[in-house]
Amino acid sequence: APGGKTTQIAALAAEKARAGAADVRITACEMHAPRAEKLAYNLKRQGAHAVTVMRTDARRIDAFFRFDHILLDAPCTGSGTMRAHDPKAAARFTPHLLKKCAAAQRALLDRALTVLKPGGTMVYSTCSILPEENERAVREVLGRKEHADRFELLSPALPTFDADRLKAELPLLPCTMEEALCVRPTDAYEGFFMVKIRRVR
């Protein structure tokens, strides 16, 4: 880290390109200079040459840029990764942290939806299991006037798992957003949330 998910996306894109698909250009946004430099180094080391690292705050990315697909791996409280009886984790988790993360998530969602092309898809994910950072954030931003009736939620699926099988095999928490996945932390999994959104117009 950083760059694990970006490297996986680049590898999948390269595999599709070898199979005859069009070349793909990937943009990774990182606002903190040291992490941006490390991200660029890690990507180069992994041979992910199709990736451009943009050192910018994604909340302020210019509307000039338009994207076919977006992974918004939002900063969060990390509530899905906390272990029971971990005093350090408990000390970090405060109402102030939750409020700060929730505000950032909504701003990032708003901008990502703005720069997503019609017909494009976005995956919103966090390593939190709190509704305030997950389904509530998504509903609130999608309900804003500028986004109303422009987007739809899609059921999650992977190349080897359809949505029903995915939901059957993961330890899920109850979620008020039917299309989303909220995975319960276990010995085998860290907790996380994800939902896929498509821009219809």
What is each stretch, according to the model?
Residues 1-201:
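S-adenosylmethionine
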